[in-house]
């Protein structure tokens, strides 16, 4: 039969795959004989198409060999019981498959079952799993007993005997088991086993059944990621079975050796495999895998050198239908190197045989790789777009949630409780669901014989049995495209960079999803052919999950209610690639919202719907937790505030009316909203000055844009005054030097250019003043300040000043060309005198001592007149001739100085000058005399006015002082009082610069007075504790009512017993509060900013007498507020009125507390009588008057009883007095009611005088009382001494009471 196949068909390089197919069903039926899986595969042949031509050829080949199938079925039927044992046993058993085949042939009873199974295998395509079992190895180990029988079937294609031994066993199974079968196999096996085109096909356990010749040659030089499944196969393992024994050592251990084990056949097989299979080239990348991962193998690189191997057009392979789909989707290039690490252990004993690979297949593989890379890039771009859409959606969701959070306040606590309850319920429900799912999975595993979707992965399992168990245990599987190691590393680097960027941009709520995304770095990104699948670990405690990407079957209901594409993986998980730790998973599960089930999923969402689902999962979780925490903190604060409010209400009922009553104060806070908009605009402007650098954003100082103002305020703008100064300098240049240049010969041809330069510089200043400044000056029209450019320009053009400015700039200099440079042509420049006068006014307005400038200006007028006269004198002398007469200038010395001296003597009329001789000289001299008299008289008068204005205040002070002294002398006031008055005048004048501020305030409007009062007094009044919390406008109104008064040292500000109608605020200086028995003891010293007398001012029910004397310690300036003015203000501010009354009541209560210590008996209470003494008294009383020395002890005992009764009565009287005083002193300052004398009851003890109002402690009256106690107490214990105030405030009455009289009163 085999010879016929060899003659008809070309030599198939993958014939060992046929044996793999035969070996695959063996473990299937072997582990699951009782589950009756055979009828089920016949029902499910349709969902798995067979698109590839090579697998189609493999299927008919299986049909042509019916006798092999039953034998293989038998082998599989008996291989099952040893699967679990082999998982724990040593992996290597070289002749396991062949031996198992022989043993099963010895059983004719199983021939029918095996033949039926092989026939069923024709109909049902057998899927081959490359490495899905390796990925889910841990999950599969959790329940090998449950699902091992089902998972054995797909592993048949990757069985250890798939390469060479499988064909041998399949052919030996056609006949009875005997030695001749082995001999015949030995002779014909060489014909059946052709040289494989690619070493990866011969090495692979599972993929060889699916790998065809046109696909594999492209990938032998590429690196594929695989994981070491514990490196099971040792050296003695057969080369044929070696790659398969590595993934599933348990299967080999379970197979029993046949009774006739031919050693020759094993040696021959080893020799042939060494020649046929190429040796893999190992790389260091494999060592980077975790050594502790038994279910995975390291990545290996296989180098295959093309040698005399011809390209094969057709390859006959026995391949399952599932593998046909896998070849179409994944390609053989990604599956060839899975078994390379397995062969790594045996590479030392094997010879590397280079094989020739077809170039066409390599090109096809490269094209596929390029396509895959393009698809991956497209997928990444789509993912980035999706992430951007996610972020936008998240921001929108956040905004919506923030709005909802404002509406939800107190409901959060209830929701939190409900969420906890729901979580507990969901946990219970999930546990129940997991149990049900496990049961359903077991049932479905029994019903389903073949997997629905191929599951490929980068992992290689230890044995085909484990792989099959895992594949059967998973009800949902999908094919994952395997990539070479280099491509995988690039993907990992790219994804890591993306994750780093996302971590910087996204918030904490997105970090959970980033950790999930990191887990998918080792997997292949989802594509159209390979959509992603999220894996849900039903045994979450066993270990972390492996990220897998599979296609969820439509008939499988979703495990998790939140995710429809979740794959439940029962069983314990072994060590795998580094994934998020269990602690991280626990944190992620805690962060999930109660609506989501605790499913840990790793995936890159391929659709916007999946992306939305994951975003909601993380965003709602983190946001809910943050919202709940914030809400709880707010609730705690609210509860604290409510408790404080309730306490205040219970303590003082006025608080309720203060807070519950509608307040107009918020209406006054409304204007603050308008200025709030200005900072927003300012911030908007400031944002422009932020500079973004590499990773930070900092604020830089904006460039100062010096722009000329659009309008100028001539009254307050200092820059305009400075400009006027330069204009005045130019004007003075012309006024002073034009006459000099005209009269004196100082302008010559050698320096004419300097004079002209200065002239035209002054002209330029004039021109700027006209064109730039004067046209921008603001002016008042109809009460409004006009700042419009056009109106300001028109106003200047229509003014008289513009006309004078035009005249002063007449271009008479053009006449220089005809008349020469004559300085007189520049006389119009002196017409800009209006700028000079304006400058004087503006400068005097800003100077603190304007009279100084006035004096200087008047002196300048005098000097200028002398300057002009000297120029005229030199001109007259030159007109008549220098030195022609005795009166003219003789030309000796400095001409200007000598002429100036002559002008001074002439104008001041000092005399001593030569007499004029000619008519011209006489007329000129007369004009000089008249001018001098007029000029000097004006100058002297102006000087007097200037000096008088400078001393006007001092003059007023002297006049007031003189009037007051005259008044005091007229009424013969004592000299001491007169001195105090004079001192007051001097101090007030020197400290304030005026005698009465009110005189100035009366002249100003209310707004001006308020502004001045705020600047002067607000800082002091705002620090007063009494007015803190009051309406700010009320304080402003109060400032206008304050009066400033100066007190001299030792002046009484207020005296004890006076009716308090004023409150005092210390502005400067100190005052002392006096008290004590003599009223001279200093109780307290109050400094600037302190307040006293406020209780009398706020007293409601009278009793507002002063309780102490207050004396100025030095010169003290006090602000006084009358009670009448305060009441008028408080009428408009009811809330502030209630607040002030509340504070006044508290002060009264605080001042009433010390009364308990004041009403104390002068004689201190006696110590308790000793018990022994009482016993002696009792005995003496029994003995009668005779005992105890004539009854002295009995008499003493009676006395003690009387004293005790008197003390009790005194205490009752004190309590009554305290009750009365507390009622009467409701509104009195500093418990003023208690200070009123009560002579009606001379027997009750009277308190000593109390201290003044707020800050003064009670006067220490213990010293005088102690002195009386020392004087009167010891000599006469039966006498009671009391001190009570007399009719006058400064008098006290001392009363002495005998005990006998007191006794009668008590009786």
UniProtKB/Swiss-Prot annotation:
One of its GO terms (molecular function) is intracellularly cyclic nucleotide-activated monoatomic cation channel activity. The chain crosses the membrane at residues 721-742, 752-773, 789-808, 825-837, 850-872, 896-922, 923-948. Residues 1026-1130 are annotated as: cNMP-binding domain. 3',5'-cyclic GMP binds at residues 1093-1094, 1096, 1106-1107. Residues 743-751, 809-824, 873-895 are extracellular. Residues 43-59, 361-386, 407-451, 483-518 have a biased composition (Acidic residues). It catalyses: Ca(2+)(in) = Ca(2+)(out); Na(+)(in) = Na(+)(out); K(+)(in) = K(+)(out); NH4(+)(in) = NH4(+)(out). GO terms for cellular component: intracellular cyclic nucleotide activated cation channel complex; membrane; non-motile cilium membrane; photoreceptor outer segment; plasma membrane; rod photoreceptor outer segment; terminal bouton; transmembrane transporter complex. Residues 165-174, 387-406 have a biased composition (Basic and acidic residues). Residues 952-1028 are annotated as: C-linker. Residues 1032-1148 are annotated as: Cyclic nucleotide-binding domain. The keyword Repressor does not apply. SUPFAM superfamilies: cAMP-binding domain-like (SSF51206), Voltage-gated potassium channels (SSF81324). Disulfide bonds: none annotated. 3',5'-cyclic AMP binds at residue 1106. The record marks 936, 940 as: Central gate. Residues 1214-1238 have a biased composition (Low complexity). Keywords: Calcium, Calcium channel, Calcium transport, cAMP, cAMP-binding, Cell membrane, Cell projection, cGMP, cGMP-binding, Ion channel, Ion transport, Ligand-gated ion channel, Membrane, Nucleotide-binding, Olfaction, Sensory transduction, Sodium, Sodium channel, Sodium transport, Transmembrane, Transmembrane helix, Transport, Vision. Pore-forming subunit of the rod cyclic nucleotide-gated channel. Mediates rod photoresponses at dim light converting transient changes in intracellular cGMP levels into electrical signals. In the dark, cGMP levels are high and keep the channel open enabling a steady inward current carried by Na(+) and Ca(2+) ions that leads to membrane depolarization and neurotransmitter release from synaptic terminals. Belongs to the cyclic nucleotide-gated cation channel (TC 1.A.1.5) family. CNGB1 subfamily. The rod cyclic nucleotide-gated channel is a heterotetramer composed of CNGA1 and CNGB1 subunits with 3:1 stoichiometry. CNGA1:CNGB1 channel binds Ca(2+)-bound CALM1 via CaM1 and CaM2 regions of the CNGB1 subunit; this interaction modulates the affinity of the channel for cNMPs in response to intracellular Ca(2+) levels. This is Cyclic nucleotide-gated channel beta-1.
């Amino acid at each position: 039969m085999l010879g016929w196949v060899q003659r008809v068909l070309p030599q198939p390089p993958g014939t060992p795959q046929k044996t793999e197919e035969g070996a695959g069903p063996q473990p299937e039926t072997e582990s699951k004989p009782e589950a009756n899986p055979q009828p089920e595969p016949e029902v499910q042949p349709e969902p798995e198409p067979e698109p590839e031509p090579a697998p189609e050829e493999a299927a008919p080949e299986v049909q042509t060999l019916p006798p092999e199938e039953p034998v293989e079925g038998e082998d599989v039927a008996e291989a099952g019981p040893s699967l679990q044992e082999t998982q724990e046993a040593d992996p290597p058993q070289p002749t396991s498959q062949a031996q198992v085949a022989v043993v099963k042939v010895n059983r004719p009873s199983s021939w029918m079952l095996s033949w039926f199974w092989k026939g069923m295998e024709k109909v049902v395509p057998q899927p081959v799993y490359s490495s899905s079992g390796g990925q889910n190895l841990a999950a599969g180990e959790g329940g090998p007993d449950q699902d091992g029988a089902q998972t054995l079937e797909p592993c048949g294609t990757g069985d250890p005997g798939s390469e060479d031994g499988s064909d041998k066993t399949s052919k030996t199974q056609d006949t009875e088991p005997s030695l001749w079968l082995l001999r015949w196999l030995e002779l014909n096996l060489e014909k059946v086993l052709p040289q494989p085109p690619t070493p990866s096909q011969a090495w692979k356990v599972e993929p060889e059944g699916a790998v065809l010749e046109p696909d594999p040659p492209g990938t032998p030089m590429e690196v594929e990621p695989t994981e070491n499944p514990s490196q099971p196969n040792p050296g003695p393992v057969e080369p044929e079975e070696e790659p398969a024994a590595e993934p599933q050592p348990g299967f080999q251990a379970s197979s029993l050796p046949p009774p006739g084990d031919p050693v020759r056949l094993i040696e021959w097989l080893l020799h042939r495999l060494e020649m046929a299979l190429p040796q893999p080239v190992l790389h260091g990348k494999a060592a980077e895998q975790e050594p502790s991962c038994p279910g995975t193998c390291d990545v290996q690189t296989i180098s295959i050198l093309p040698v005399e191997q011809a390209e094969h057009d057709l390859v006959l392979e026995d391949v399952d239908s599932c593998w046909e789909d896998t070849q179409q989707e994944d390609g053989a290039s990604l599956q060839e190197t899975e078994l390379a690490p397995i062969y790594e252990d045996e590479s030392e004993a094997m010879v590397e045989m280079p094989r020739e690979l077809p170039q066409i297949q390599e090109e096809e593989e490269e094209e596929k790789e390029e396509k895959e890379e393009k698809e991956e890039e497209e997928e990444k771009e789509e993912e980035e777009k999706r992430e951007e859409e996610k972020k936008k959606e998240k921001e929108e969701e956040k905004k919506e949630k923030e709005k909802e959070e404002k509406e939800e306040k107190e409901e959060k606590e209830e929701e939190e409780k409900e969420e906890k309850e729901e979580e507990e319920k969901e946990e219970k429900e999930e546990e129940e669901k997991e149990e049900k799912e496990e049961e359903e999975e077991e049932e479905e595993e029994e019903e389903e014989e073949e997997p629905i979707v191929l599951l490929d992965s980068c992992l290689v399992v230890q044995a085909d049995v484990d792989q099959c168990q895992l594949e059967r245990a998973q009800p949902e599987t999908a094919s994952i495209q395997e990539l070479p190691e280099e491509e995988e590393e690039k993907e990992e680097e790219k994804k890591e960079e993306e994750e780093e960027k996302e971590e910087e941009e996204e918030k904490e709520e997105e970090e959970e999803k980033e950790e999930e995304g990191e887990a998918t770095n080792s997997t292949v990104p989802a594509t159209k052919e390979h959509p992603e699948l999220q894996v849900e670990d039903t045994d979450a405690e066993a270990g972390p999950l492996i990220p897998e990407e599979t296609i969820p079957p439509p008939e499988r209901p979703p495990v998790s209610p939140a995710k429809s594409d979740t794959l439940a993986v029962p069983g314990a998980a072994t060590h795998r690639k580094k994934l998020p730790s269990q602690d991280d998973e626990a944190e992620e599960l805690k962060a999930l919202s109660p609506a989501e089930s605790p499913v840990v999923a790793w995936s890159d969402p391929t659709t916007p719907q999946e992306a939305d689902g994951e975003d909601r999962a993380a965003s709602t979780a983190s946001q809910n937790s943050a919202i709940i925490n914030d809400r709880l903190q707010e609730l705690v604060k609210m509860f604290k505030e409510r408790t404080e409010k309730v306490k205040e209400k219970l303590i003082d009922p006025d608080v309720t009316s203060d807070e519950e009553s509608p307040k107009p104060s918020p209406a006054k806070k409304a204007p603050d909203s308008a200025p709030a908009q200005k900072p927003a605009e300012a911030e908007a402007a400031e944002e422009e000055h932020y500079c973004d650098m590499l990773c930070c954003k900092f604020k830089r100082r904006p460039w100062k844009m010096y722009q000329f103002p659009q309008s100028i305020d001539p009254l307050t703008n200092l820059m305009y005054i400075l400009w006027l100064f330069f204009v005045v300098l130019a004007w003075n240049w012309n006024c002073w030097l034009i006459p000099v240049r005209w009269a004196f010969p100082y302008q010559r041809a050698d320096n004419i250019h300097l004079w002209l330069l200065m002239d035209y510089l002054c002209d330029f200043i004039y021109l700027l003043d006209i064109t730039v400044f004067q046209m921008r000056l603001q002016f008042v029209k109809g009460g409004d300040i006009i700042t419009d450019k056009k109106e300001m320009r028109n106003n200047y053009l229509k003014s008289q000043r513009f006309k004078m400015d035009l005249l002063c700039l007449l271009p008479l200099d053009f006449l220089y060309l005809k008349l020469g440079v004559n300085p007189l042509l520049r006389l119009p420049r002196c017409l800009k005198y209006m700028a000079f006068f304006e400058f004087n006014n503006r400068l005097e307005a800003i100077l603190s001592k304007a009279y100084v400038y006035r004096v200087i200006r008047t002196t300048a007028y005098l000097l200028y007149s002398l300057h002009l006269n000297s120029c005229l004198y030199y001109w007259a002398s030159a007109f008549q001739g220098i030195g022609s007469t005795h009166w003219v200038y003789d030309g000796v010395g400095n001409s200007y100085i000598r002429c100036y001296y002559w002008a001074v003597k002439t104008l001041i009329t000092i005399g001593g000058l030569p007499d004029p001789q000619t008519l011209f000289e006489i007329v000129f001299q007369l004009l000089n005399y008249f001018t001098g008299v007029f000029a000097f008289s004006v100058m002297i008068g102006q000087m007097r006015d200037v000096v008088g204005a400078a001393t006007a205040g001092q003059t007023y002070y002297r006049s007031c002082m003189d009037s007051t002294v005259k008044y005091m002398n007229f009424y013969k006031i004592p000299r001491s009082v007169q001195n105090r008055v004079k001192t007051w005048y001097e101090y007030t004048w020197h400290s304030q610069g005026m005698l009465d501020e009110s005189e100035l305030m009366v002249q100003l409007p209310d707004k001006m007075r308020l502004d001045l009062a705020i600047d002067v007094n607000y800082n002091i009044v705002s620090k007063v504790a009494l007015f803190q919390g009051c309406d700010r406008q009320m304080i402003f109104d109060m400032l206008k009512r304050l009066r400033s008064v100066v007190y001299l040292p030792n002046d009484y500000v207020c005296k004890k017993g006076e009716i308090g109608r004023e409150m005092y605020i210390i502005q400067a200086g100190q005052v002392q509060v006096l008290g004590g028995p003599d009223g001279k003891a200093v109780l307290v010293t109050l400094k600037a900013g302190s307040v006293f007398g406020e209780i009398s001012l706020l007293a409601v029910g009278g009793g507002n007498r002063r309780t102490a004397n207050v004396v100025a310690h030095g010169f003290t300036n006090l602000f006084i507020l009358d009670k009448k003015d305060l009441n008028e203000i408080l009428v408009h501010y009811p809330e502030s009125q209630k607040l002030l009354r509340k504070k006044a009541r508290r002060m009264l209560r605080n001042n009433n507390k010390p009364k308990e210590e004041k009403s104390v008996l002068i004689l201190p209470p006696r110590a308790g009588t000793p018990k022994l003494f009482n016993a002696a008294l009792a005995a003496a009383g029994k003995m009668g008057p005779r005992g105890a020395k004539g009854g002295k002890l009995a008499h003493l005992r009676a006395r003690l009883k009387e004293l005790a009764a008197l003390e009790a009565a005194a205490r009752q009287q004190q309590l009554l007095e305290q009750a009365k005083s507390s009622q009467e002193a409701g509104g009195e300052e500093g418990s003023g009611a208690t200070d009123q004398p009560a002579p009606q009851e001379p027997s009750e003890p009277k308190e000593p005088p109390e201290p003044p109002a707020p800050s003064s402690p009670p006067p220490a009256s213990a010293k005088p009382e102690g002195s009386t106690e020392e004087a009167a107490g010891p000599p006469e214990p039966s006498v009671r001494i009391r001190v009570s105030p007399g009719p006058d405030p400064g008098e006290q009455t001392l009363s002495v009471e005998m005990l006998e009289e007191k006794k009668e009163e008590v009786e």
